[in-house]
């Protein structure tokens, strides 16, 4: 049986004391020392993977326009993309950022852009921008998913901890106090990024300003059309069966079931997400600030925001 670490304990999930083993400490030190080598390795390998992705998108375009699953990181968009890919006759390109200022250049650069948005690095970014936006004026179907900003922030901080936020202490994190981890989260993460994404990515790319146009909060999904873009926006918290139904109505065909994908617990440092989630119960001011963001105000009605507040404070 797995033993759960008490929220205020500095001990790791799998036994041990409050101090990490020497081997764990050394590996964190080596991670920092290895940064320049990782950067060089990435510079050599990334273009090859990018070229492979560019060929794949060209092949998809030759068969017909793929659906662009375009959503911020850690919003459950992988589950939507997987369902569409399992649907006969449908192919997808999944990407989180299409604006170059949000492309992360690697471990020697900042993970936060000048506009306050979280950056990301993926082989689909430049290929999708070039082939689906710059080199084409054909109609394009787009799916985006919105996730509550508190869940978004905790999930991104822990899932990408090894790459960005906790890179220098990722292996030691299970031994660190919850208070220390939460303070680091508060001090380093771009907390408004999930809301900024809708302005600096989605609106910039599609011309659709969901904050101005509004959202069907009780239903949890809405279709937007502007020029060549036909967009379906889903809220992550609605039932997966409702997501499937909305996609089927939008595409006018049956869609494979939407199922959970890309779970956070396989990437985050053990126990850290759960401890930060527990610590959030004592942070009503933070919760209120996140629920006051334009994205939360647009995608959730007052009753839904109250329910979210109660959930995070439980």
Question: What does each of the following model-derived ranges do?
Answer:
Residues 5-314:
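Membrane-interface amphipathic segments in extracytoplasmic regions
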